[in-house]
Amino acid sequence: MREIVHLQTGQCGNQIGAAFWQTISGEHGLDGSGVYNGTSDLQLERMNVYFNEASGNKFVPRAVLVDLEPGTMDAVRAGPFGQLFRPDNFVFGQSGAGNNWAKGHYTEGAELVDQVLDVVRREAEGCDCLQGFQITHSLGGGTGAGMGTLLISKIREEFPDRMMATFSVVPSPKVSDTVVEPYNATLSIHQLVENSDETFCIDNEALYDICMRTLKLNNPSYGDLNHLVSAVMSGVTTCLRFPGQLNSDLRKLAVNMVPFPRLHFFMVGFAPLTSRGAHSFRAVTVPELTQQMFDPKNMMAASDFRNGRYLTCSAYFRGKVSMKEVEDQMRNVQNKNSSYFVEWIPNNVQTALCSVPPRGLKMSATFVGNSTSIQELFKRIGDQFTAMFRRKAFLHWYTGEGMDEMEFTEAESNMNDLVSEYQQYQEASISEGEEEYDEEAPLEAEE
């Protein structure tokens, strides 16, 4: 029944993936070795979206773990849920990609990719009716970015009609791991524009801000950041895993969220925000959830939606929530902030409900928005890219792996096109003729 095959590539992807599996195993009542000891039939009803049932009441994630060096894999294997995964589904090289996109995409990664595809094929064959794939990776490194996008395009070739969702960690403006991040990210986005159906953009800096501002953590660890990401991933996939009044799957999400095929980069948010360990002790109401969910401080990508407009957005509410209250709240948000929504897509807020709340909460909400302000994120990466590419800095690492400068130029222009497409739809209004855009007056959103 509508299975999803999950891939995690590179260090970042594997750490986020591990946090995700930990979260949803808990929600489905599985312990660290995949044995079910839950309390509710709802946990079992659609378990098979993400898990295969093995003998002895054990459930095994339909996950493929990929990396070009064994380090992160060993850490996952040694972690609390390391025994959950099927041992054959760990596919790793020995050399590492060294933050080099070309190594991940053309040399080291390309050698490993067939081995990964064999595992993916085996997982897909074990499905009744495969719905699609989800990939967790970062765009700033070598393996997740280079090999991740290679896998996406290979899977696209083999399963052209299945959905492809990616949870992509975008390099942040201030926190940088490596100097070549802008190169890796631009080359990756160039691939994602063509090959992904929906990309949820997450960025470390926004996560740091949430941890420090909202959760009051002075010194957030990657564990805390991954906890936030896994909350969102669990929220986005909740409709697939539990029965609810208004269910949704990856394809419905895409149909409702993507007005133009290239514009499939979403911002995500979650409410109520809680730190690991400290569950909120106060009752939350639907208005509060809605308020927090639409709060720019709550977005997990560093772009402020007040600088753009929403093309579409969708909200997933979990828990014992009154349908009517949710509808009223969402309508309320739209009416009060109409300047932040494009007027040429009338009912552009989609809601879905699921009756099973996350662990430790009475109710929660997950937000996915397709906002034109995501262009800020691409602009920022593009500017950094241009600054280095103009001087051909660090290029020899890429050309040495057989890449051509032309590819960089193409990726750069594709990303610039993406930015201007977002800008064009931000400024479009109903009254204008077909192709006349008002260049003089960009829309300012008044608070």
Curated annotation (Swiss-Prot):
Q: Where is the composition biased (Acidic residues)?
A: 432-447
Q: Provide this UniProt record's keywords sorted from A to Z.
A: Cytoplasm, Cytoskeleton, GTP-binding, Magnesium, Metal-binding, Microtubule, Nucleotide-binding
Principal localization reads cytoplasm
- Listed GO cellular component terms? cytoplasm; microtubule
Cystine bridges: which residues?
none
The residues that cross the membrane are none
Which parts of the sequence bind Mg(2+)? E69
Entry annotated with the keyword Cytoplasm: yes
Where in the cell? Cytoplasm, Cytoskeleton
Among InterPro entries, the record links this protein to: Beta-tubulin_BS, Beta_tubulin, Tub_FtsZ_C, Tubulin, Tubulin/FtsZ-like_C, Tubulin/FtsZ_2-layer-sand-dom, Tubulin/FtsZ_GTPase_sf, Tubulin_C
GO terms in the biological process aspect are: microtubule cytoskeleton organization; mitotic cell cycle
* Residue segments, region Disordered: 425-447
Which amino acid positions bind GTP, per UniProt? Q11, E69, S138, G142, T143, G144, N204, N226
Subunit composition? Dimer of alpha and beta chains. A typical microtubule is a hollow water-filled tube with an outer diameter of 25 nm and an inner diameter of 15 nM. Alpha-beta heterodimers associate head-to-tail to form protofilaments running lengthwise along the microtubule wall with the beta-tubulin subunit facing the microtubule plus end conferring a structural polarity. Microtubules usually have 13 protofilaments but different protofilament numbers can be found in some organisms and specialized cells.
Function description: Tubulin is the major constituent of microtubules, a cylinder consisting of laterally associated linear protofilaments composed of alpha- and beta-tubulin heterodimers. Microtubules grow by the addition of GTP-tubulin dimers to the microtubule end, where a stabilizing cap forms. Below the cap, tubulin dimers are in GDP-bound state, owing to GTPase activity of alpha-tubulin.
* Family per record: Belongs to the tubulin family.
Alphabetical list of PANTHER family matching this protein:
TUBULIN
Under what name is this protein listed?
Answer: Tubulin beta chain
Source organism of the structure = Phaeosphaeria nodorum (strain SN15 / ATCC MYA-4574 / FGSC 10173) (Glume blotch fungus)
Gene that encodes the chain: tubB
